[in-house]
């Protein structure tokens, strides 16, 4: 499914200026865990940006993810001079035209990607931007660091399809359930001691080691490598026991285990409810996941941004390949509460109207803008790198101050590419309809580093 909205005053084909803001056609992914049909935010965004999608959305199909970027598996596209180009092709084509034009004039050419971004990332688009709409739990998984990603890509290119690491941020847009990072070891041990089905799934000779990380690793790897029939039988007993409880006797963790079992009966990943932290993010709260941090998204909607990778090492809650050995060796085994990203505020705007989520990586940051009765337009600080704008809800125009053009009739689901060093403004079209916008860009961290 692609974004085909071209109802704007600024025609992508007419101007070779490197500050053109252009519409993107983006691709949805129909993974089985996604919400079905019009219940999915991804489907609503598809309907919003292209009227023709309204007849294409099928209520029996899961719409799990919307991808925005230049990943080889689902690159965004741009209509340019009556051709449909992948985002990378579009950038390269326009950059070549700009360079050729500057070579015949006294003006110097500037970079669409941004000079610092090109030095740091070359011609690779620095990030992958997504929307997720989750019906059933995603796999117990973690992402490799840069070194391991290169090794996995070289050894297993059919499984791990790129050589990049995948740090990521998930910003909740609805209540958002997740398992993330290891619980304190004392909590895990307490569950082993008090939940017989969990204890019986571990070896009788499991030794409590003084080294907490090594002990935790032995618990995890022993569980992942346990006999499948043993795990299945113990989970069945656990499910039966929890179902025998009255509803008022069950706690949130009991309900989580029952939910996971109903979705993945007999899967060892169900036991990870006792190993990983269970959290429920409120809308606007954000979770950062670095390399080697185990996690599983369970339900809800989020905006997600990451390095441009699709590398996932799985070990549970999935019918897909489980790479138990790789996962067991790559996890950090860091215990404690998950890393929530505290949004930064702009001095001239309230947290209601602006939030910047900046995790500790160079590839990306995400800004949130909200237009309402009290704040009908917002000037966007230009980034020294490329940006992708997602209109999550509402109607607006974008005034491009760098080339004195305006894009009108933007609405829910409109997605745009913004070149580096472009000044622009969001303008609310209808004061009765609030507007929510997410902007992914290269982290200001790398520009601040270069200014030191």
Swiss-Prot record:
**Cofactor(s) in the UniProt record:** Zn(2+)
Q: Which GO terms describe its biological process?
A: carbohydrate metabolic process; GDP-mannose biosynthetic process
Q: What is its EC number?
A: 5.3.1.8
The yes or no answer to whether the keyword Cytoplasm is present is: yes
Swiss-Prot/TrEMBL keywords: Cytoplasm, Isomerase, Metal-binding, Zinc
This chain's protein is named Probable mannose-6-phosphate isomerase
Active-site residues, Swiss-Prot/TrEMBL: 314
Gene name, Swiss-Prot/TrEMBL = mpi
Top-level taxonomy: Eukaryota, Amoebozoa, Evosea, Eumycetozoa, Dictyostelia
Chief subcellular location equals cytoplasm
Annotated signal peptide: none
Q: Which Gene3D superfamilies match?
A: Jelly Rolls (2.60.120.10), Phosphomannose Isomerase, domain 2 (1.10.441.10)
GO molecular function terms listed in the Swiss-Prot or TrEMBL record: mannose-6-phosphate isomerase activity; zinc ion binding
Write down how the cofactor binds this protein: Binds 1 zinc ion per subunit.
Q: Which Pfam families match?
A: PMI_typeI_cat (PF20511), PMI_typeI_hel (PF20512)
The record's listing under PROSITE patterns reads: PMI_I_2
Kindly state which reaction or reactions the protein catalyses.
D-mannose 6-phosphate = D-fructose 6-phosphate
């Amino acid at each position: 499914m692609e974004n085909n909205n071209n109802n704007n005053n600024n025609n992508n084909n007419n101007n070779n200026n490197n500050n053109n803001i252009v519409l993107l056609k983006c691709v949805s992914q129909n993974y089985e865990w996604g919400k079905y049909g019009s219940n999915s935010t991804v489907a609503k965004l598809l309907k919003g940006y292209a009227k023709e999608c309204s007849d294409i959305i099928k209520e029996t199909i899961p719409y799990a993810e919307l991808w925005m970027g230049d990943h080889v598996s689902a690159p965004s596209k741009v209509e340019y001079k009556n051709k449909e180009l992948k985002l990378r092709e579009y950038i390269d084509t326009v950059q070549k035209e700009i360079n050729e034009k500057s070579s015949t004039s006294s003006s110097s050419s500037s970079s669409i990607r941004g000079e610092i971004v090109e030095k740091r990332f070359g011609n690779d688009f620095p990030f992958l931007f997504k929307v997720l709409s989750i019906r059933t739990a995603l796999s117990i998984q973690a992402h490799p660091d840069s070194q391991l990603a290169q090794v996995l890509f070289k050894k297993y290119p059919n499984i791990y399809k790129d050589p990049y690491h995948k740090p990521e941020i998930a910003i909740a847009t609805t209540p958002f359930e997740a398992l993330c990072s290891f619980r304190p070891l004392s909590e895990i041990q307490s569950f082993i001691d008090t939940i017989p089905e969990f204890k019986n799934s571990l070896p009788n000779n499991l030794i409590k080691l003084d080294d907490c990380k090594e002990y935790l690793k032995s618990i995890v790897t022993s569980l992942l490598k346990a006999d499948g029939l043993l795990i299945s039988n113990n989970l069945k007993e656990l499910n039966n026991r929890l179902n025998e409880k009255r509803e008022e006797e069950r706690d949130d963790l009991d309900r989580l285990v029952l939910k996971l079992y109903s979705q993945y009966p007999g899967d060892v990943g169900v036991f990870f409810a006792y190993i990983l932290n269970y959290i429920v993010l409120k809308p606007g709260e954000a979770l950062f996941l670095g390399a080697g941090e185990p996690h599983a998204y369970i339900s809800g909607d989020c905006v997600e941004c990451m390095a441009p990778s699709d590398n996932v090492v799985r070990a549970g809650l999935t019918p897909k390949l489980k790479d138990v050995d790789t996962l067991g060796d790559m996890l950090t085994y860091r215990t404690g509460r998950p890393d929530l990203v505290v949004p930064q505020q702009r001095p001239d705007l309230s947290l209601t109207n602006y939030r910047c989520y900046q995790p500790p990586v160079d590839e990306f940051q995400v800004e949130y803008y909200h237009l309402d009765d009290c704040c009908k337009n917002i000037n966007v600080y230009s980034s020294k790198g490329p940006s992708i704008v997602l209109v999550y809800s509402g109607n607006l125009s974008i005034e491009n101050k760098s080339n004195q053009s305006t894009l009108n009739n933007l609405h829910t689901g409109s997605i745009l590419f913004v070149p580096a060093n472009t000044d622009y403004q969001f303008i609310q079209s209808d004061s009765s309809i609030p507007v929510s916008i997410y902007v992914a860009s290269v982290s200001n961290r790398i520009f601040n580093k270069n200014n030191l």
